[in-house]
A protein has these predicted regions:
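Short, small-residue alpha-helix embedded
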Residues: 237-250, 387
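Conserved cytochrome P450 K-helix/beta-meander segment immediately N-terminal to the heme-binding cysteine loop
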Residues: 50, 323-358
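Cytochrome P450 heme-thiolate monooxygenase catalytic core
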Residues: 9, 53-60, 76-78, 92-240, ...
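Cytochrome P450 heme-binding "Cys pocket" and the immediately downstream C-terminal segment
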Residues: 253-255, 379-413
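N-terminal membrane-proximal hinge/A-helix region immediately C-terminal to the signal-anchor transmembrane segment
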Residues: 1-79, 94-106, 127, 139-142, ...
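Conserved cytochrome P450 K-helix E-x-x-R motif and the immediately C-terminal K′/meander segment
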Residues: 2-20, 189, 193, 269-311, ...
């Protein structure tokens, strides 16, 4: 029980290793089932998805996020998804490539002018929020400096609720609950301000999320909730993935050099375009491997609506069922040397004699799976590719000597306490 509060990742990993693909954990009067096998994950997330609604943690996050796309279920979720789906159409995302590249170029210029260590997670949070604002909202978020801190408090509280299975009353005078309420109010204020700005200044083409929300004729509260959800989900996962990427590439300079060589050969001194994505396969494999080891969505909590059976276990209605991508992505039956950072395991030309037909589809689900597959995955991957190629072709980023990088399991998987790194300009020949 102590590990639920002190080291959730170790609890998940140890439980999977000792108890197998379904782990039953009793917490007071409540029971949680951890799911750690691709076939069982497919059952929960796709085949029988209608029986599994959003679960612990995300239910509690609703207190801050409202009924946005991340927390809603049923017909409400379907309507919300239909409303904003056009914003994420492949052709529209492709048209945003120049916007993303220009935002990353601004980051490169800031890094070039830096003296001393840079807190890289802070930089990635600012960058991803900036990209989100320009590409999806047609808005400038630079003035809303409290966004990152407020979202961190919301994640902290949601995860606290998850590991206690919501048994701590909301009125309990805990410092984290006070911080949560202050952050919730801050997020609502920012979202309401952005909505009012769009009402006052309609966008010319009306293709952005704010315009779509206004056209949907929802209430101001519904628009606010959708916007808060988008702001969180749209920046946090990409920022966390990039933080882990810079950490792992610092640990594996040979892989960083291969990525640089590809960037030099494909891009030269030019900004990347959407058409360049298929010409940067090694960079894409690096990002895939980063997300295998540190999936941005590291657990997928659900609540069973009716009795079910998973892996031989009877699952009573009302049970908390958690699919755990963090352990799925390290399952030794599907991932040889699962702790090794090896981007080439995603090379389509690499043949594995133990798995001639390839690994199961649900052995790798960094963006979730089934009907609730992450709507913004293509934008996030494009952004990550652009950041790694543009930053690494100009710089080497190195962690401070002796700095201990520890995962922190929030709604996403973050580096605890940030990631300070020194920036060294690369001698490009």
């Amino acid at each position: 029980l102590k590990k639920l509060f002190t080291d959730r990742l170790a609890l998940m990993s140890d439980s999977a290793q000792v108890h197998g693909d379904v782990v039953r954990i009793a917490i007071g009067p409540k029971t949680m089932y951890l799911v750690n096998h691709p076939d069982l994950a497919k059952h929960v997330l796709a085949d029988n998805a209608a029986n599994y609604h959003k679960g612990i943690g995300l239910q509690e996050a609703r207190r801050a996020l409202g009924d946005g796309l991340l927390t809603s279920d049923g017909e409400t979720w379907k309507k919300q998804r239909r409303t904003i789906q056009p914003v994420f159409q492949p052709k529209r995302i492709a048209r945003q490539a120049s916007v993303v590249a220009n935002e990353v170029e601004g980051l490169v210029k800031r890094l070039r002018d830096t003296t001393g260590p840079v807190e890289i997670l802070h930089e990635m949070t600012g960058l991803t929020l900036g990209v989100l604002g320009k590409t999806l909202l047609d808005a400038d978020l630079a003035g809303f400096t409290s966004l990152g801190h407020s979202f961190e408090a919301v994640q902290d509280q949601a995860m606290f609720e998850a590991v206690t299975l919501s048994m701590v009353p909301q009125w309990a005078p805990l410092k984290k609950q006070l911080r949560f309420r202050e952050s919730r109010d801050d997020l609502r204020r920012i979202a309401e301000e952005l909505v009012e700005q769009r009402f006052a200044n309609p966008a010319e083409n009306g293709e952005d999320v704010l315009s779509r929300l206004i056209d949907s004729s929802g209430t101001r509260e519904q628009m606010r909730d959708e916007l808060i959800t988008l702001l969180l989900a749209g920046h946090e996962t990409t920022a966390s993935t990039l933080g882990w990427a810079f950490h792992l590439l610092d640990e594996h300079p040979d892989i960083a050099e291969k990525l640089r060589a590809e960037a030099d050969a494909v891009l030269g001194d030019q900004l990347p375009t959407h058409e360049d994505l298929h010409r940067l396969p090694y960079t894409a494999r690096v990002i895939e491997e980063v997300m295998r080891l540190y999936p941005p969505v590291w657990l997928l909590p659900r609540v069973a609506q009716a009795d079910d059976e998973i892996g031989g276990y009877h699952i009573p209605a009302g049970s908390d069922v958690v699919v755990v991508p963090y352990t799925l992505h390290r399952h030794p039956a599907f991932w040889p040397e699962p702790e090794k950072f090896d981007p080439d395991r995603f090379d389509p030309d690499r043949f594995d004699p133990d798995r001639p037909s390839g690994r199961p589809r649900y052995a790798y689900i960094p963006f979730g799976a089934g009907p609730r597959f992450c709507i913004g995955n293509s934008l996030g991957v494009m952004e990550a590719v652009f950041v790694l190629t543009m930053v690494l072709r100009d710089f080497e980023l190195r962690k401070l000597p002796g700095y201990d990088v520890v995962p922190e399991a929030m709604l996403s998987l973050r580096v605890r306490g940030g990631l300070p790194m020194t920036v060294h300009t690369r001698n490009r020949r």
